[in-house]
Each structure stands twice: as C-alpha cells, then as structure tokens.
C-alpha cells in the first residue's frame, strides 16, 4: 500500500499557526465545535454528525449509550470516574488522520478504543490528562478474507468473533489463532499478543500478522513498508496506545480440520483426592501434542459449610474424539475423560463453546459482539509459572479462593509453538520455560458497598503466589493490564524510572527497544496513557 496521500499543506499550516490560539480556558462546548470544524476541514470524506459525534452537551443519553456500549469493566463507568469530553466514531481512515491533527491543535488528549476490554479501562478513561477525546473505532469493522493466499485484512473495530465467523463463511478449514473471548476488539487485542486455544499449535495472533495500517503521531497513514520494521515489530505485542492508531491488520490464516473436539470436565476438591489431577496437569499440559489445549478454570461452588473449589478442565483438540481419547489415555488418564465427555463440532462452533456460550448455540451469535456473561466490576492480575506448584501451595490457593465471593483463576498451558518462538521475535517475551499462565479475577455487583475488600483479596492472593511464579522480573501479561505494577505520570523523566519496573514485568528485555522506537516515532509522547511506553531520553 505504501504511504497514503499526505494531508493538504493548508491543513499543516493551519495546525502550525494555530497551536497557540486555543487557551486552556476554552469551554468544552467550544472545543467540541472547534474539533468538528477542524476535522471537517481536514478530511475529504463526509461524516454525519448524528452518527459519529457524541457529547454530553448535545445528547446525554446517546453519549452514555455509546460510552457504555463496549466498556467491559463497570468499575470504570462509575460517576466518580473521568468521562471523555466527547466521543468521535470515525467511519473512514482520513477521519482518524484528521482527528490526530485536530486533537493536537486543540491540545486535547486522545484515547482510542476498539473493543473496550482494557482491564484498567485505559482505552476509555484518562486519569492523567483532562479533558480528553474518546475515539471509538467500532464503526470501522470491515473484514476481507482472501482464501487464495491464506490471508485477511480486518479493521480494528471488528471483534474476534466477527473475524472467525467471516473466515468460516469462506472456508471450513481455515482459522486464526487469537482470543478465547469472542467480543474482544481485534485492534487492541493483537497489540498485546492475542493468545487463544490454538496458541500451542500456531503461536499468538501477533505471531501471525503480515502487515498493518496505522496512523502515526503526525497524522500519516502507513503500512508495514512505510512504517519500517522497528515500528512493525513494536505494534505486534508492545501493547496499544503507544505508537499510533491501528486501523487494520493483515493476518495469516492457519489450517484447521473440518472436525475438532471440545470437552469440559469439572472436579471438586473432594473428587480430586490428593490433588492428583491438577498436579498431573501441571506436569503434562505444556508437553501434550500441540493440537491439544487444556486450560483449567478454578471457581467456588456451594454455600456455607458446603462451599468448595471446583476445577474445570476446558479443552480444544484439533482432530476427532477417537484420536483425542488415545492421547488422553496415554498422557493424562488421571482426568478420567470419556467418549461421552467429548463433543465433535466445527472449528467455528468451538469458538462459541470456548467463549462460554451453551453447546449448540447458533454461530451467528459471534456477530453480535457480546459476551455470554453479564458485565460486572472486576479486578484482574496475572502471573507465569515455570515450575509446578507443590501440594502445600495448592492447599493455600484453595483456602484463599474459599474466602472470596466470586473468585476466578484460570491456568492456560504453554509449550508447543510458544516454546519455539524466540523471546525477542516480537515484544511479547513469555516463551520457552513457561509451563502455564495464571489469570486471577475477582468480580462484584454494583450493589456491593465494599468493593475495596475484593481488590484487597486479589492483592493478598497475588502476594501469596510470589514463591510459586516467575521472578526477576515477575512476569505479567500486558493484555491483562494491572496498574498495581506501576503507572505513568505527566513527568516523562519520572515516567521512565517508574516504567522500568512494569515494563520489565510485561516485556522483559524487550522494553528498552520499545522505548527507543517510541522516541523515534513519537518523541513528544502524543500517544500516552497510564501504562504507555515512554520515549527513551
């Protein structure tokens, strides 16, 4: 594609001479009008205001509806949380370019949202820059599949569920190895790595990106050739909101069989005597055939004295159940899997199943962009385990889980292709040596009067896990944002010092390279948030 046509020289001159004409005392309503006028002057493609621009001063109910539409964590929709001054939903690439020019001109901070799954709400809440504009990419969701060359272009506003559905429309033997949650926005999802149930066979979504279209801090539209290999490296796992606005990804499609097999086998503590099943899983999950992905979900069931921890072994096998049973009998007989437990289906049907929809749910549910679970307030954290957790450690985990109202812990197996890809291939470094990734989640309803107790609980569990997880650094998954690890301030020098800590957690030795690339492509730190990559100074 190369570099798109540059914006008119007049627009650049307007930007230059007007940088100092907007005063901090300008009213928000005035800024809204100026932003609209500026975008209209800097794009050749018309946009209907009633469908693309939403402000509390214009229509409060519509503004709230759009703001809440894809915000996944209700914790960040509370009245006490900062709200954008207004929301702009572009429908064309040039609108994104113009928005960058105009937000710079008006000295307004910009946040960008594709699917709204940021665990700390950073794609739609700013606590360090106010006022701010929310650019919502949900109207840019085209998916173009090319089966002949095993590729697809997908715009950032599309969900992974939409992408999977459109692939299956064209072919029953092609897929893409990205997220387990079908409502994830593909734009931000891939920037953090994008793991899914085929990661052991094909790696991450970010490992299977061929090209991208981004708009940089100068409002230029770039593809891989134009942005250069450093920037292309950075955006595939270096997390969103740092290097530019991702408009679209070109992805590599991977082969899948016509028939796959899924199962979910749930055990209580009483059924797993001596923790033999979970202990065996720790020893074999990363060593099983690459076609088999078995994750474990820890929940709490029952009440009062009957309360217990359950472990659900939730799996996808790229093949039929006969072959799967042979693998399980040989490698993991302790689970006691039976033919009755196994369900054969298409790869697309398995997406809905793994996402949490009931078996036999029509696959067009994936086009709705919604989770099968109700929205709640939640806090999450992550870890990586490199040696099996001993019996004593497991007992302590179970005791912690039984103390919380709605706890969830998920163990996702690594190994396979994940162990073959070098740590520096893309910014995502969690590769060889990782047995499994841990996700901790606690959630609560809005009616809960003491949300702080849930956050204290998860921090206590995280502290308890210290001896059993990676160290120096204690690794974390950037798509499970955790501001407990640290956050940026407006002072760039202070930012860099603080960022070295959480940067090592997320990116290990890749963090310095990310900061150097940031300094080259966005030295003024236009794209920033509480955990964005700061420019190296």
From Swiss-Prot:
Binds 1 FAD per subunit in a bicovalent manner. Coiled coil: none annotated. Residues 1-27 form the signal peptide. Its cofactor is FAD. The keyword DNA repair does not apply. Disulfide bonds join 38-102. Keywords: Cell wall, Disulfide bond, FAD, Flavoprotein, Glycoprotein, Nucleotide-binding, Oxidoreductase, Secreted, Signal. One of its GO terms (cellular component) is plasmodesma. Residues 80-256 form the FAD-binding PCMH-type domain. It is found in: Secreted, Cell wall. Belongs to the oxygen-dependent FAD-linked oxidoreductase family. This is Berberine bridge enzyme-like 26. It comes from Arabidopsis thaliana (Mouse-ear cress).
